[in-house]
Amino acid sequence: MGGDNTLNDFRHIPRKRFGQHWLKDQGVLDQIVKAAELNPEDCVLEVGPGKGALTEKLIESQAKFIQAIELDRDLVIGLKKRFNHQNKFSLREGDILSAPLDAENGVTINKVVANIPYNITGPLLKRLIGELRKAPENSFETLVLLMQKEVAQRLLARPGNSNFSALSVRVQLLAKCQDVCDVPSKCFQPAPKVDSKVVMIKPFASIDPDFYEVGNLLEKLLKHAFAGRRKKLRNTIGSFVTSNDQIKEFFAYRGISLDQRPQEISPSNWFGLAKALKETCVIENGTFQSK
């Protein structure tokens, strides 16, 4: 990340392998900080501070403490020169996919702000909010993430929308997602080939006790169904629905039709179906079979 003045201060060529694009639009930077709703008790994890434009705004905010993680050693040197005199700031050199997510001074981090490199969006989301089969390492209250617009649209999509996908189901079962703003490619230096979007994610404070028990089955179910997202359910999972009375009852109770497509089924109904399947089916050779 970086603002106009900061961009000029750092003599650093963006590295493609790190997915580096400096955010230079001050209006977008302000919207990110506003969306984080920072107060004097908040401790923020900033992912990929880059050249420090957003870092500066976070330090100026009411937040109690900022812990940043940066992978590029050259940028780490510049960031330390610029911010190490700040008592409320600490910088850790490392890969966000493996580095500790706690603050170096021992405070508990409750919010995350990140400009996500496009090539690690999926793995980073799993680490920050968890996945169907595994709870997250840390519990965060709010995440404000800048990501590729196409991915953001999938996180935000509702059932029936053309962007609704297996990713939509996975994330919406774990958190509430809210659109913050669009970020055209011209807001970055260098400009990426695609536009971006800022999304606010609020992980649910409590998860259904059965959630992680059926997570593995639900993951396989989504993979199976959305592999043919244009196909009706009767052509993807219909064989075990029509042969299983309990599953047929579930479909009837929830008002689900086999003539619907996978993107028309709500996250809660996918979860409910997985719970019903756990009691009545097993997976053999990649297909669902009645017990």
Swiss-Prot record:
EC annotation from Swiss-Prot or TrEMBL: 2.1.1.182
SMART domains on file: rADc (SM00650)
Keyword Magnesium carried by entry: no
Catalytic activity: adenosine(1518)/adenosine(1519) in 16S rRNA + 4 S-adenosyl-L-methionine = N(6)-dimethyladenosine(1518)/N(6)-dimethyladenosine(1519) in 16S rRNA + 4 S-adenosyl-L-homocysteine + 4 H(+)
S-adenosyl-L-methionine in keyword set: yes
Enzyme kind, highest EC tier: transferase
Family statement: Belongs to the class I-like SAM-binding methyltransferase superfamily. rRNA adenine N(6)-methyltransferase family. RsmA subfamily.
Protein name from the UniProt record: Ribosomal RNA small subunit methyltransferase A
Species annotation: Prochlorococcus marinus (strain NATL1A)
